[in-house]
Amino acid sequence: MKYYIFDLDGTLADSMGYWYGSFREDERYDHERMQQVRLAMKEKYAEIIQPRPGALELLERLYSEGAVMCIASATDRWVSEPFMKKFGLDRFFRFYLDCTEAGAHKDKPDIFLQAAQRLGASIAECTVVEDSAYCAETAHNAGFRVIGIYDPNTAPVSYTHLRAHETAANLV
């Protein structure tokens, strides 16, 4: 059986430009400002964010092949749930695990380890699909197979520098 742990923003959802556009550089790590943006984003996420090209087709193919998949995202589930339902993405995934629920950000492997455990899979059986270089590195260092997906909004360096076993420019 194949197990996949997907990131959402920048990997399946074309949302990173919006997230980064919502902050000035000095606000990016301000907790209060992050909460304000999350609340605003919940209202707009399903309206303005689209799936990345090829996302639905890839998920449909993997699902039809019997893959077992989940979401492991820094974005709180309550923010992205309307988007997931609008585009029917929720039907492909066993569960949605966010960093708040996991108790740590993606600079620590907790979310990936908990996702594998909830899938009933070993680390060696799971593939993590990520756009973020630091998240890909975290998963890689924890022993996961990693596929890095390039998103120009999150990759200040070439996606070939991701700590990934494979990289792709898109999901098509």
Predicted regions and their residues:
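Helix-loop "lid/cap" segments that line or gate small-molecule binding pockets
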Residues: 24-28, 32, 36, 83, ...
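Acidic, Mg2+-coordinating phosphoryl-transfer loop and its flanking beta/alpha structural elements
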Residues: 128-159
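Conserved small/polar residues in nucleotide/adenosyl-binding loops
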Residues: 160-167
